[in-house]
Swiss-Prot record:
The organism of origin for this protein: Dianthus caryophyllus
Active-site residue numbers: H164 (proton acceptor), D392 (proton acceptor)
EC identifiers of the protein: 2.3.1.144
Post-translational modification: N-terminus is blocked.
Name of this protein: Anthranilate N-benzoyltransferase protein 1
Keywords annotated in UniProt: Acyltransferase, Flavonoid biosynthesis, Transferase
pH dependence: Inactive below pH 7.0.
EC primary class: transferase
Gene Ontology BP, a term: flavonoid biosynthetic process
Length: 445
């Protein structure tokens, strides 16, 4: 699909901001490699009624000048996003130098319908998300890049490339929400807090009370037929309607379970089982379920301040044999998921922070495979708490929000419906030879 870059602007904060180095926590640094950005897209379809898309300050649909001016103002309180990475000894820091965030304006000759259901893939990422040149070193590239793309149908997309060392998805949403509010002439909803050293530094001396297997590298054990480099991976979307989710829950035997199982726990367990079956693994093989968890509500001694703008993502891990996943009831599997999630309390998370300090140079735990696979494991990331409907810049709420590209086999995202109808979308990357079998097992209940 064709894409033409019309203009690129380095947007700097509208006012003077603190010129300092920002200490990064171990949790900031361990979630991704420093030479990477996370891509996501918002889709806005132009309403049929022109009166529905009139911004109070502009008659143009998604006026780039308004977005750039608002972005410049949003970067004042969120000033680390306008900085650059640097190395201080053996640690990365953010140099808050106000060099700016990149804003790209682009046009495509295609219509939004050409992308179908907006399933993540290389082409969608290429067209809608700005690219980054990492070749000039760690301090050369922006930590935030945004692309406004106009399509022939009149619709637009806003693609984000956000650096995970700066913040996690929830904090990035707060930035986007503030940017959108400013574009409408409103004040930001909250004041961001950037001090990670005060709130998430390790204890001295460390108090490591648990084994923290989630930080062990997940080394892939690919079978020979997947090692030839010729086996493709495929990314696709699977939708579970509210009725299907209810049917799945009705399969549960809750007679001996005194705690209610959440929708995420049930669906994550179902995905775990379905992937293990689709891969055709032997019954004795172990398969891990990896679940990124927002720790904001779990850290309480002391609690994090509202508006904390860093990474608070921790990993919960379940382990089971393929035979157990296949033979045991879904209730048992979902119970294991619930137990793993409940274990991430304040005591455990503080211990995890101390553990990372005791292991200098700890590798990114689940993103270190040159084959870009988690095989035989699976990662289920929930975006259910990101209220993307609030990202209204003055021309209406987005009709779609999702990940732009999933690079690793076994990695998936659960995203709730924007319509609030109780349905969920699963975006997943699997080896192509496993995908059709996964679909069969995923809908077989």
């Amino acid at each position: 699909m064709s894409i033409q870059i019309k203009q690129s602007t380095m947007v700097r904060p509208a006012e003077e901001t603190p010129n300092k180095s920002l200490w990064l926590s171990n949790i900031d640094m361990i979630l991704r490699t420093p030479y990477s950005h996370t891509g996501a897209v918002l889709i806005y379809k132009q309403p049929d009624n022109n009166e529905d898309n009139i911004h109070p300050s502009s008659s143009m649909y998604f006026d780039a000048n308004i977005l750039i001016e608002a972005l410049s103002k949003a970067l004042v309180p969120f000033y680390p996003m306008a900085g650059r990475l640097k190395i201080n000894g053996d640690r990365y820091e953010i140099d808050c130098n106000a060099e700016g965030a990149l804003f790209v304006e682009a046009e495509s000759s295609h219509v939004l319908e050409d992308f179908g259901d907006f399933r993540p893939n290389d082409e969608l990422h290429r067209v809608m998300v700005p690219t980054c040149d990492y070749s000039k070193g760690i301090s050369s590239f922006p930590l935030l890049m945004v692309q406004l793309t106009r399509f022939r149908c009149g619709g637009v997309s806003i693609g984000f490339a956000q650096h995970h060392h700066v913040c996690d998805g929830m904090a990035h949403f707060e930035f986007n929400n503030s940017w959108a509010r400013i574009a409408k002439g409103l004040l930001p909803a909250l004041e961001p807090v950037h001090d990670r050293y005060l709130h998430l530094r390790p204890r001295n001396p460390p108090q490591i009370k648990y084994s923290h297997s989630q930080f062990e590298p997940f080394v892939p054990s690919l079978p020979n037929e997947l090692l030839d480099g010729k086996t493709n991976k495929s990314q696709t979307l699977f939708i579970l309607s509210r009725e299907q989710i209810n049917t799945l829950k009705q399969k549960l035997d809750l007679s001996n379970n005194t705690t209610r199982l959440s929708t995420y726990e049930v669906v994550a367990a179902h995905v775990w089982r379905s992937v293990s079956k689709a891969r055709g693994l032997s019954d004795h093989e172990e398969i891990k379920l990896i679940m990124p968890v927002d720790g904001r509500s779990r850290i309480n001694n002391p609690s994090l301040p509202k508006g904390y703008c860093g990474n608070v993502v921790f990993l919960a891990v379940c382990t089971a044999t393929v035979g157990d996943l296949s033979c045991n009831p879904l209730t048992d599997t979902a119970g294991k998921v619930q137990e793993a999630l409940k274990g991430l309390d304040d005591d455990y998370l503080r211990s995890a922070i101390d553990h990372t300090e005791s292991k200098p140079g700890l590798p990114v735990p689940y993103m270190g495979s040159p084959e870009k696979t988690l095989y035989p494991n699976v990662l289920v990331n929930s975006w259910g708490r990101i209220p993307y409907q609030a990202m209204d810049f003055g021309w209406g709420s987005p009709t779609f929000f999702g990940i732009s590209n999933i690079f690793y086999d076994g990695q998936c995202f659960l995203i709730p419906s924007r319509d609030g109808d109780g349905s969920m979308t699963l975006a997943i990357n699997l080896f192509s030879s496993h995908l059709s079998r996964f679909k069969k097992y995923f809908y077989d209940f």
